[in-house]
């Protein structure tokens, strides 16, 4: 019995050890491998120090991909976080609440659909010849706006980003619905008695009361925006040219097309630093706002 009591505390260390094994060790190994020039087909590795990072920061494709990720992040914050909050507030309004289960299902459905299916759907919608989008524009007399949405440098990235927003906004809205349901009805009732309208209630009650969920949503959205891969890779492959290249597709091509494993490890390290820095900034911002 005494021996069992001695063992039990060590059992609680198992999850931490598993986390260390599958998360931290691969991260450190990736950083270590980024200091070498090596190929997946050869066991030999040549130590080159920070040369991969120097080349990366002089590579115009890296800055093109980073710019696209920043654009992805900005649009995602506006559409997913702010848009998701507005959508959740509308679905939780008393006038819409009886229809809320139906609309929740409609908006959450894209979240559970495979990205491959979604890509095929939007590939059909964006098709320049038979796509629904161009046919709709022609039907309302806007023929001059029709184009190859995924094949045009000026629209490829925005078209890919739209797919992500369509798929993800419902998930963020569901998170906000849970948060809004925890807000006491007395706050809204008092605001109505003071003559506050729907918009005033939204900005003075809903937004402040869902601040913690907003923090979670922003961190998730920013992390997703800087690690996005499926949408640009399946829809455009990073093209046309490098118009829709993002850091993850850039990493993938460097590793598995060009077999530049050390260079790809350097890209992965930079992505890790960016996402970690953004998360820490959000934590600092959230703590500051909470203290105020």
UniProtKB/Swiss-Prot annotation:
Which superkingdom, per the lineage? Bacteria
Going by the UniProt record, its keywords in alphabetical order are: Cell membrane, Membrane, Transmembrane, Transmembrane helix, Transport
Keyword Zinc listed: no
GO CC, one annotated term: plasma membrane
Q: Please indicate if the UniProt record lists Transmembrane as a keyword.
A: yes
Q: What does this protein do?
A: Probably part of the binding-protein-dependent transport system YurMNO. Probably responsible for the translocation of the substrate across the membrane.
Q: Which family does it belong to?
A: Belongs to the binding-protein-dependent transport system permease family. MalFG subfamily.
Name assigned to this protein: Probable ABC transporter permease protein YurN
Q: Can you name the source organism?
A: Bacillus subtilis (strain 168)
